[in-house]
């Protein structure tokens, strides 16, 4: 049997999915051959839209569909993608089991018209305030430099400023002591770039909402606010500008790409930087998480990321098109991705592949059942290793799976443990903005307004921090 899918792959890895060990094994196991069309990840959205415009020539589905809510509703209305709820109930016991355990995911996948148009990606690591997604842009401060200069970890915005000044004034000593190539940079970030943004530093100003990636926050009475018009935001941005005028901020922080940001990190040049996991930029032995800073008027808070209550969730991960003749086969094949031993591999990588860097070894759990055990990656960057083998697509890794079907990734466990210790006590707000599936008109309206307003707000944010 054969099915055809469109997918994407990172530029650094093979562009032929059938060369990947995960798909080779799946073909043996299911006896289904997949005819892939693969686009490089960073060109994917344009190429995908072009492919979907060729109505008579559609594949059976999109495996890594990357569809927004608006895409799902628009393509459903045009008859390009099909409703899936009956297929799920008939042919997909693995996905059904996930929905039974966590009914909220079925609700979140269901469009306002009552249909389900896509298969989701779900990654649980902790839940609620303890979910790993609760904070994205973690500030990591160079503990080695602090110790060398005899300084404590700062706990207020003023103390941080003094520490950054010390990094600036002792740049030559630090350079010599730690044999650093290039100039010492007290603080670096990539403005408006998700986890690399420095907004977490300004949570202590004014009302304490700071800023979030999409600039929405929820008050404890349930009111939704826009962060960039709050008093505290303005005060916080002024303070960040002050740091710029004192030569404490990397001049490239407003223009640099990820690769430049990482290259400087690998040369150990940062006193403070922001990202999901410091190991992707430098190493986690020299740095510690900088705790929530108390602002000038004594406020201290950590605003959680929106949507993080339900852990990692991507609604529009995988779709089937109206050209799909054998929908039962397609659904049954996709359901294999939701098998508890399969999902972690699709998400992170595989085991037992010769001449390749494996993420796992196949081991056993305490009851003697098969379990994927994370290998020690040594000096390898987790992201690079994952990109070589993982396939992403629709999957579900649930909290119950850890130590039963898969061990927690070491980097995630390290991040979770440190996050809980450093930030949990300061996550004051009750709510985060949830993952709402609105009607096509509302989605369209929101995306129009939001695109323009977000663009303008972020332009101004960068401009004000840089130029005042």
What are these regions (language model features)?
Residues 1-159, 171, 198, 210-216, ...:
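Conserved N-terminal structural module of periplasmic/extracytoplasmic solute-binding proteins
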Residues 79-109, 164-168, 178-217, 264, ...:
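Carboxylate/His-rich catalytic cores and anion/metal-binding grooves
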Residues 39, 63-64, 254, 273-276:
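Short beta-strand and adjacent tight-turn residues that come in two discontinuous sequence segments
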Residues 33-39, 251-252, 288-290:
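General small-molecule cofactor/ligand-binding pocket signal
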Residues 9-18, 125-140, 147-153, 190-246, ...:
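Extracytoplasmic/periplasmic substrate-binding proteins
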Residues 85, 89, 112-196, 218-264, ...:
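Helix-loop-helix "hinge/cap" segment bordering the ligand-binding cleft or interdomain interface
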Residues 340-460:
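Conserved small-residue motifs centered on glycine
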Residues 285-294, 303-375:
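Polar, glycine-rich mid-to-C-terminal structural blocks
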């Amino acid at each position: 049997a054969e099915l055809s899918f469109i997918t994407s792959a990172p530029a650094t890895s093979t562009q032929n999915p059938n060369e990947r060990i995960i798909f080779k094994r799946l073909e043996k196991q299911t006896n289904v051959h997949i005819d892939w069309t693969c686009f490089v990840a960073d060109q994917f959205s344009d190429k995908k839209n072009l492919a979907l415009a060729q109505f008579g020539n559609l594949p059976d589905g999109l495996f890594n569909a990357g569809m927004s809510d608006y895409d799902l509703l628009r393509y459903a209305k045009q008859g390009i993608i099909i409703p899936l709820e009956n297929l799920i109930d008939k042919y997909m016991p693995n996905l059904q089991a996930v929905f039974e355990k966590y009914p909220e995911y079925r609700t979140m996948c269901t469009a306002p018209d009552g249909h389900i148009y896509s298969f989701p990606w779900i990654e649980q690591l902790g839940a609620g305030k303890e979910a790993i997604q609760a904070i994205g842009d973690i500030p990591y401060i160079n503990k080695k430099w602090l110790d060398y200069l005899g300084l404590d970890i700062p706990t207020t915005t003023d103390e941080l400023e003094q520490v950054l000044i010390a990094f600036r004034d002792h740049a030559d000593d630090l350079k010599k002591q730690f044999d650093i190539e290039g100039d010492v940079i007290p603080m670096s970030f990539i403005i408006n770039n998700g986890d690399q943004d420095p907004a977490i530093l300004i949570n202590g100003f004014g009302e304490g909402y700071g800023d979030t990636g999409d600039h929405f926050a929820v008050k404890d009475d349930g009111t939704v606010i826009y962060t960039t018009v709050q008093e505290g935001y303005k005060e916080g941005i002024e303070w960040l500008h002050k740091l710029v005028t004192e030569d404490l901020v990397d001049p490239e922080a407003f223009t640099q790409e990820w690769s430049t940001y990482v290259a400087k990190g690998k040369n150990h040049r940062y006193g403070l930087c922001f990202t999901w996991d410091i190991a992707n930029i430098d190493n986690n032995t020299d740095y510690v998480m900088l705790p929530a800073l108390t602002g000038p008027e004594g406020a201290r808070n950590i605003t959680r990321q929106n949507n993080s209550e339900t852990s990692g969730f991507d609604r529009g991960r995988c779709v089937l098109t109206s050209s799909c003749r054998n929908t039962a086969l397609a659904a049954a094949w996709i359901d294999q991705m939701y098998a508890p031993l399969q999902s972690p591999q699709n998400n992170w990588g595989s085991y037992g592949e010769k001449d390749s860097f494996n993420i796992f070894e196949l081991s056993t759990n305490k009851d003697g059942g098969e379990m994927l055990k994370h290998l020690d990656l040594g000096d390898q960057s987790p992201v690079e290793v994952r990109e070589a083998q993982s396939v992403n697509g629709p999957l579900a890794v649930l909290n119950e799976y850890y130590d039963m079907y898969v061990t927690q990734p070491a980097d995630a466990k390290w991040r979770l443990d440190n996050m809980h210790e450093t930030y949990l006590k300061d996550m004051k707000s009750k709510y985060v903005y949830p993952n709402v599936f609105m009607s096509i008109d509302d989605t369209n309206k929101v995306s129009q307004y939001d695109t323009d307003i977000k663009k303008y707000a972020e332009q101004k944010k960068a401009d004000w921090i840089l130029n005042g």
